[in-house]
Amino acid sequence: IRALPWDNPAFVAPVLGLLGFIPGGAGGIVNASFTLDYVVHNTAWVPGHFHLQVASLVTLTAMGSLYWLLPNLTGKPISDAQRRLGLAVVWLWFLGMMIMAVGLHWAG
């Protein structure tokens, strides 16, 4: 695990997205259960689950894809400042989505 490129936003973004997908998938089991869905339907639980799924996995994977794609399309590697900014954006997005989703689940 230490040998993985943790300083590359193109790697970190989808990994964090997958980490957010784990509790989102557990919430999907709740939504799929008729008895539990009856309790959480039309509450803040549902948007909390949606944001864990879409905002964590899909958006972070798109961010990571762009951090890989743009340097390859332009032929210019990203600078150290851009790499650090990319890591900050990815981590802040992930933490913000986790805080928001936990709040929505708690309220639901």
Swiss-Prot record:
Provenance organism: Thermus thermophilus
Compartments it resides in: Cell membrane
Disulfide bonds, paired cysteine numbers: none
Segments traversing the membrane: 10-30, 50-70, 85-105
Binding site residues for Fe(II)-heme a: 51
PROSITE patterns, alphabetized: COX1 (PS50855)
Keyword Nucleus appears in the UniProt entry: no
Binding site for heme a3: 49
Pathway annotation from the record: Energy metabolism; oxidative phosphorylation
Keyword Cell membrane recorded: yes
Protein name: Cytochrome c oxidase subunit 1
UniProt xrefs under Pfam families: COX1
Keyword entries, A-Z: Cell membrane, Copper, Electron transport, Heme, Hydrogen ion transport, Ion transport, Iron, Membrane, Metal-binding, Respiratory chain, Translocase, Transmembrane, Transmembrane helix, Transport
GO biological process, one term: oxidative phosphorylation
Any one GO molecular function term: cytochrome-c oxidase activity
